[in-house]
Amino acid sequence: MSQPGPFEETPPHAGRHEVLAIQQRNLRRLLTYVWHCSPFYRRFYADHGLCERDLGEVGIRDLPPTSKDVLMAHFDCVVTDEQLRLADLQAWIERDTPPASLFARKFIVLHTSGSSGRMGIFVYDRAAWRRILARMNLPHFDDGADARVVYYGAVHSRFAGAIMCACVLGTRYALSLLSVLEPHTRNARQLNEMRPKMLIGYASSITTLADLALTGALDIHPKIVVVSGDPFTAEMRRRVESAWDVPVVNLYSASESLMIAISPPGAAEMCVLDDLQIAEVLDEAGREVAAHETGRLTLTNLYNLSLPLIRYKMDDFVTKGALAGSPPFGTITDICGREHEMLPVRLADGAVDDINPIMLTGCGGFDIPGLERLQFVSRAPERVDILYAGIDSLEARIGESFRALLAAKGAAQTVTFTVSRVDALAPDSGTGKVPLVRMAPRV
């Protein structure tokens, strides 16, 4: 099988039942294709007792999960195109090609930061990219091809945000990429000159720009703001909406799937694009969590066949939303953190355990009015410095919440901590994002 069957598109106004039926048919298409074209998946499934005739009926939960470490270790056997070889892709990335460049003139290449221990490389073919382009219809924005769009994030490498903007929005509008690693005052001057009509970037960096706008240092008037890349708290939304009274869209995008979920302007929940992927939110035992519960996201990308991701364990923890009425798509209410943002703490018995990032957000008692952003700096398992951006005098509330976490963990007597307010939390020099947990150099 050299060519897959056609990807089934979701018609406008489709109901939930129809969306899920299309999802299942596209899953069958994907499984049939990888059985014939991906040596890794064919062997992987056969080793778990599956054969080709099972692919027409097997449920998603009957398939074994995969991970970044597994797929990167077997990359050359996972991909379905012989032009894709990990060593060649790594060498191409190191050449620092322009964002809109294509590998072998046909593949769009992204990579992760490697902060979790191994850099992930993800490849999309033109068909997958066209599918994303067709879905990237942002509301309240029809200013034409000469409209200025600015992406504000990490632009020094092939991270998903910059590449997606260059390859999708760059084909429609006058796009500029602005590095979040440059001084904010310099970026504000450039933005004042650019006067963008659409502003896109990490939630943390867009909030910083909103603060500059509220003080008068930034004078731009976008018609729409799109945030992505890191969690967007209620306080951050309030500040952005105070700076610009325009629609604010929260896009959940990752290297593994460029459009996982999106929130319409004014909506608290994000709609999962169930026709493009299967998003399972699972507990530690691998069971689907109930509505309003938090679990780890396991993703099956249905639209990208070049590097198939099937039951792929993401690093993200999300809170599952409810299905009120009969919406076509499922929802998530919060992106709580990432697996590699665990905070190590010393327990009373001398052992070292981790506090899950879920508990370092609003899920763990940090949903505090006026609190914009937190960062937990681990100096040692016995010492944590908590930095926060927000209004004055929140130290006691933050300390109370963290003390309760330590007590529940059995570390209240063995871990000391400080809480300090800062004007802004500095982004990571590699990713441009503000990490929830930062490991300070051990002294």
Please name every model-derived segment.
Residues 1-111, 117-131, 137-144, 219-220, ...:
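Nucleotide 5′-phosphate-binding alpha/beta core
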Residues 1-10, 69-224, 228-244, 257, ...:
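Active-site phosphate/ATP/adenylate-binding loop shared across adenylate-forming ligases
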Residues 117, 286-287, 350, 432:
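Detector for glycine-centered tight turns/loop "hinges" at secondary-structure junctions
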Residues 147-149, 297, 384:
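Conserved hydrophobic helix-helix packing surfaces used for dimerization/oligomerization
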Residues 175, 248, 279, 415-419:
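Generic structural signal for residues in well-ordered beta-strands
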Residues 183, 232, 281, 393-394:
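Glycine-/small-residue-rich active-site loops that bind phosphorylated ligands and cofactors
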Residues 199, 303-413:
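AMP-binding/adenylate-forming catalytic core of the ANL superfamily
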Residues 232-324:
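Conserved AMP-binding/adenylate-forming
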